[in-house]
Amino acid sequence: MSKKKRTASSTRWLKEHFDDKYVQQAQKQGLRSRAVFKIDEIQQKDKLIKQGMTVVDLGAAPGGWSQFCVEQVGPHGRVIACDILPMDPIAGVDFLQGDFREEAVLSALLGRVGEQKVDIILSDMAPNMSGTPAVDQPRSMYLVELALEMCKQVLAAKGSFVVKVFQGAGFEEYLKEVRSLFSVVKIRKPDSSRSRSREVYIVATGFKL
């Protein structure tokens, strides 16, 4: 049987991907994904991650953000990561594979966190995109709501939250909720974020317990 022909959109995506300077840089530097440049840019601007901190990384696979965070927190810090997809081990990262939307997975993740509060929660989660905004946007907003709920459970006073959000239905309401829970809230569009993508990162600091 012959392979199905690629669609025009998938061919365009592949060309964009392999021509992408951040993809090329990630490969040259032995990084797990181009996404590391997003968190690196946020870190350079906002200086959120420090030595000895405890970080939770949601939507971690293939591990670019976790790889970056381990270097930032050092030997006395902790990085706890979760993703529905498998992830090759990273020294210093406690990884849980599972669907964050499931209660059992959330309970297991909270068990990994333990009694100590978390300094930063990072979420780069995104649903499998169907290409239909009326389907994709609610799925995306559900994930970011779950990430915010986790903040309410485990984030330390004055802690930080970085979350990828797609602009669209529910975005303004979500932003308002985040602003009610944190002292300072900024919206970042990293240079490495593809210009035609609706994604932005909400960077929130000063969690109010």
From Swiss-Prot:
Its EC number is 2.1.1.166. Keywords: Cytoplasm, Methyltransferase, rRNA processing, S-adenosyl-L-methionine, Transferase. It holds the Pfam family FtsJ. It is an enzyme of class 2 (transferase). The active site is at K164. Gene3D superfamilies: Vaccinia Virus protein VP39 (3.40.50.150). It is found in: Cytoplasm. Belongs to the class I-like SAM-binding methyltransferase superfamily. RNA methyltransferase RlmE family. This is Ribosomal RNA large subunit methyltransferase E. It comes from Tolumonas auensis (strain DSM 9187 / NBRC 110442 / TA 4).
